[in-house]
Amino acid sequence: MKGQQKPSDLFFDLDRTLWDFDLNSREALHAIFEELAAPILPASLTVAHFIDVYEVENEKCWRAYRAGELTQSELRPLRFQRTMEGLGIPAFKEMHSLADSMGEAYVKRAPYCTRLIPDAIEVVRTLKERGHRMFILTNGFDEVQHIKMKNSGLDPFFEIVFTSDAIGHKKPHPEAFSHCLNQTGSIPRHAVMIGDDLECDVIGALKSGWRQGHFNP
């Protein structure tokens, strides 16, 4: 139809936008705490307290990772090592070994958790039916983000999953956004970034000339 506006190309963040990172992470942490940590750590330490401290330290590590101060391989065990320190547990050899084991177990377990943000499937299905091309643009690790997509049922709705690992740049770096345009043939005025992170998703997209949708439930 003459004059009909082309449907926007929608680029979704994954964690905390579609995939319920907090609930899935806590489910995985609860399981690995009971399996690996509870037999070793003081009986007075509850899983709830462990998770509370972990979430604080994990966010600090992710900020450092996004700033280029940590590598992926450094982040995975370090967030658990710092959790132990935050709990006041002495940093002796066994604790470093436990932190390494928990880091490996978490990455193996968490991606297979399947809780989504409420109504996520219904929303992306409706958008797909309306003719939007849809993609994922995430700072998460390549190997785990694809597992999340497949196991949670999101995969069929998205043409390409772009990860910072594969791109070589993390949001909000402009190269992350320009790479997506180059690969999809989209242009800034047709591209919309939808995500929960104000700095990475919204401001990053704004600086690249994209439209933005801030998911802030």
Annotate each predicted stretch with a short phrase.
Residues 2-56:
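Active-site neighborhood of HAD-like aspartate-dependent phosphohydrolases
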Residues 6, 73-77, 92-100, 104-136:
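Short, acidic loop-to-helix structural element flanking the phosphoryl-transfer center
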Residues 25-36, 54-58, 80, 103-110, ...:
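Hydrophobic alpha-helical core bundles mediating ligand binding, dimerization, or RNAP-core interactions
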Residues 56-104:
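A metal-dependent, Asp-based hydrolase signature
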Residues 108-116, 121, 135, 140-192, ...:
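Substrate-recognition "cap/lid" segment bordering the active-site pocket of phosphatases
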Residues 190-217:
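Acidic, Mg2+-coordinating phosphoryl-transfer loop and its flanking beta/alpha structural elements
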